[in-house]
Amino acid sequence: MFRTISNIFRVGDLRRKVIFTLLMLIVFRIGSFIPVPGTNREVLDFVDQANAFGFLNTFGGGALGNFSIFAMGIMPYITASIVMQLLQMDVVPKFAEWAKEGEAGRRKLAQFTRYGTIVLGFIQALGMSVGFNNFFPGLIPNPSVSVYLFIALVLTAGTAFLMWLGEQITAKGVGNGISIIIFAGIAAGIPNGLNLIYSTRIQDAGEQLFLNIVVILLLALAILAIIVGVIFVQQALRKIPVQYAKRLVGRNPVGGQSTHLPLKVNAAGVIPVIFALSLFIFPPTVAGLFGSDHPVAAWVIETFDYTHPIGMAVYALLIIGFTYFYTFIQVNPERMAENLKKQGGYIPGIRPGKATQTYITRILYRLTFVGSLFLAVVAILPVFFIKFADLPQAIQIGGTGLLIVVGVALDTMKQIEAQLIKRSYKGFIK
């Protein structure tokens, strides 16, 4: 790992990509501190907020707590992406057709995803501006329809800029731009979290100091165990044996070798967690339009609180559902079976074609069950950590944040390593 990091700066092209990515993240962090005009951020207080707003603040690197131009983060884009992927599943025939057209079709779908981001972002921004002014009186000193619309437009523009920033990182930097931005937001909150632990559990602890240190050490061990578990599950594979039949090409026998088909335990990576989080946050944000005094809005806000038993169950089910959904987008058993048949390959004891497809699908369902359950369990661990250690809710230790940070870090390092390997072998190819 450390060798890979040192090698990055020896390759000019890769070095430029890494520097470009870092510069884009600096722009993101600067924007997180630029407040929306016409607002008073001093009235916002997200300490001990264990609801959707606390989540959004954590994953935006504190941008929501500053009520900055990036307060909504990249979540509307993720929600729009989910909607577009659902519509591609023969719901909208034109979208399904574009999905099969390769690069040209993907460009058209990406354009519609951008349009969807703007629409959903504006709805969410309007709900956020009205709702936050109800929750935190004085946030908008002179509320009116025109002021609310202006603030919604500024927040939507901030999300659109982040979307563009993510696309630039993907095209000219390293890793998936959207995931990198979310990663940066979570990582930016780590120093504040550590400082909060110190101020609440170490500073002026008195006679409780030793006990608090023991609890914090146990917590650190638990977090380390989660990180190891996440890496293990992300790297775990099920190897299905594949045999290729011998055939004659001219007078030479070709094929006959044995290999394997690798299926990951968690083929979807951390994308299901990001998708679930985006969808989980959306309803309470929109409910904010009606204020906490409205009975239905109050119920939605309370239910979509991840410390609430129902909210916890909904969040876990969303993660499990999206893991299955995204796994079968990433891995297509029908296409795999078809390719094996065309190449003269078969799984020992399984007939080529439909039987192979059914076999791969069955194994994929079992693997995904384990992977999705692991993601769901780890994602809701912060609730138990916080209660066990009696820590402020704002710290949001472990769980979703750890999954995203470790998952994105692993994926990015793999991409960088692949780039390094490609450059190392360039001389042999020539």
Swiss-Prot record:
The cysteines covalently paired via disulfide bonds are none
Sorted alphabetically, which InterPro entries does this protein's record hold?
SecY, SecY/SEC61-alpha, SecY_CS, SecY_dom_sf
In the record, biological process GO terms are:
intracellular protein transmembrane transport; protein targeting; protein transport by the Sec complex
Classification via PROSITE patterns: SECY_1, SECY_2
- Keyword Coiled coil in record: no
Membrane topology value: Multi-pass membrane protein
Q: Which UniProt keywords apply?
A: Cell membrane, Membrane, Protein transport, Translocation, Transmembrane, Transmembrane helix, Transport
Where it sits in the cell: the answer is: Cell membrane
Q: Which residues cross the membrane?
A: 18-38, 67-87, 118-138, 145-165, 177-197, 213-233, 270-290, 309-329, 369-389, 390-410
Looking at the keywords, is Transport present? yes
General function of this protein: The central subunit of the protein translocation channel SecYEG. Consists of two halves formed by TMs 1-5 and 6-10. These two domains form a lateral gate at the front which open onto the bilayer between TMs 2 and 7, and are clamped together by SecE at the back. The channel is closed by both a pore ring composed of hydrophobic SecY resides and a short helix (helix 2A) on the extracellular side of the membrane which forms a plug. The plug probably moves laterally to allow the channel to open. The ring and the pore may move independently.
Q: Which PANTHER family match?
A: SECY/SEC61-ALPHA FAMILY MEMBER
The UniProt family comment states: Belongs to the SecY/SEC61-alpha family.
Give the NCBIfam families listed for this entry.
Answer: 3a0501s007
Q: How does it assemble?
A: Component of the Sec protein translocase complex. Heterotrimer consisting of SecY, SecE and SecG subunits. The heterotrimers can form oligomers, although 1 heterotrimer is thought to be able to translocate proteins. Interacts with the ribosome. Interacts with SecDF, and other proteins may be involved. Interacts with SecA.
Name the record gives this protein: Protein translocase subunit SecY
Q: What organism is the protein native to? A: Halalkalibacterium halodurans (strain ATCC BAA-125 / DSM 18197 / FERM 7344 / JCM 9153 / C-125) (Bacillus halodurans)
Write the lineage as a comma-separated list. Bacteria, Bacillati, Bacillota, Bacilli, Bacillales
